[in-house]
Amino acid sequence: MHLQPSTAVVTGAASGIGFALSARLAQAGARVVMTDIAGDGLAGAVEELAAHGADVTAVVADLTDPAAVQELADTAFGRLGDIDVVCNNAGVVGPVGMPLWSVPLDEMHAVFDVNYWAHVHVARAFVPRLLDSGRPSHLVQTASMSAFVVGAGTASYAASKHADLAAARSLRADLDGTPVRVSVLCPGRVDTPMTRGLVAPRNATGNTTISADEAADAVWNALGSDRFYIFTNADAQTRLGDQFNDVWRHLAREKYWTESSSPSVNSSRP
C-alpha cells in the first residue's frame, strides 16, 4: 500500500537528488523540513520551492556532528509533529581516480563521515521517535550502485556506500515487524551538480544517466511498500549481473558448486 506522506525530512536537500525528493514530496502536499550544510544553497532551494506554494522549512546542519543531528530531529518533530518519511540522502563523492594507497587518509575519513556516519546519526536520532509514534513511516537511505559495483579509483566512495548499504540492511532487519519501512536507494549515474564533470572510473561498466527527478519518482513509488532495493537506471540489471556472476565464477572454481548449477543473476525467475 502506498504511503501518502503529509510530513517529511530530507537531508542533503540543497541540490541534486535531495532537492528533487523535497520537490516531489512537497508537490504531493507534504510539509518538508529540508536540511543541508550548504546554507546559501539551501536557502535558494527553499525559496524556489516556496515560490511554487510548497510548505518547506530550511535547517542548516552539519550531519557529521551527532549533537547537531539531535537538534535537527528536535526541530523537525517540533515543526512537523509526527514524521512520515525520512530521506537520509546527504552524500559526497570525494577523491576519485586514485588507487587506495594514494588517497589522503583525511579525505577518505571525510567521505565516510558524510556517506556513512551522517546516515548513522540520522537513523539513531529519528528511528526511535518514528517507532514511538506507532504510525506507518518510511526511512529511505541513499546509497548508490557503487554499493555493489566497484571500479578502479573509487576506494573511498564505493567503500562508504558498501558500509551504508550494510547499515540499511541491518536497519531493515532491526525494524522487521514494526510500522517503520526501510528502503535503500541505489542510483547509477544521475545528472546532478555533484557528479557533473566526473568521468566513469576505469573498468566500470554501464553509463546510462537519469535525472534527479527520475530518482525522486522511483523513491515516491516505493513509499509504504516492502520494496527494499530501489534501483533507478536501466542498466542496473546488467551491471549487477556482471558483478555477481564474477562472484559465482570464483565460487565455482573453489568447487562449492559447478558452473552449471550456480545461480544466475540474469535468470528469468521472479
UniProtKB/Swiss-Prot annotation:
BP GO terms, sorted: antibiotic biosynthetic process; lactone biosynthetic process
Gene giving rise to this polypeptide: ptlF
pH dependence: Optimum pH is 8.0.
Matching InterPro entries: HdxpentlteDhPtlF, NAD(P)-bd_dom_sf, SDR_fam
EC number: 1.1.1.340
UniProtKB keywords: Antibiotic biosynthesis, NAD, Oxidoreductase
Misc: S.avermitilis does not produce pentalenolactone itself in vivo but instead a group of new metabolites that are neopentalenolactone derivatives.
Transmembrane segments: none
Residue positions binding substrate: S144
Name this polypeptide is given: 1-deoxy-11-beta-hydroxypentalenate dehydrogenase
Pfam families associated with the record: adh_short
Domain of life: Bacteria
Catalyzed reactions: 1-deoxy-11beta-hydroxypentalenate + NAD(+) = 1-deoxy-11-oxopentalenate + NADH + H(+)
One of the record's GO molecular function terms: oxidoreductase activity, acting on the CH-OH group of donors, NAD or NADP as acceptor
Disulfide bonds: none
Enzyme class: oxidoreductase
Role played: Catalyzes the oxidation of 1-deoxy-11-beta-hydroxypentalenic acid to 1-deoxy-11-oxopentalenic acid in the biosynthesis of neopentalenolactone antibiotic.
Residues forming the catalytic site: Y157 (proton acceptor)
Binding-site residues for NAD(+), renumbered to this chain: 12-36, 161
Pathway involvement of the protein, from the record: Antibiotic biosynthesis; neopentalenolactone biosynthesis
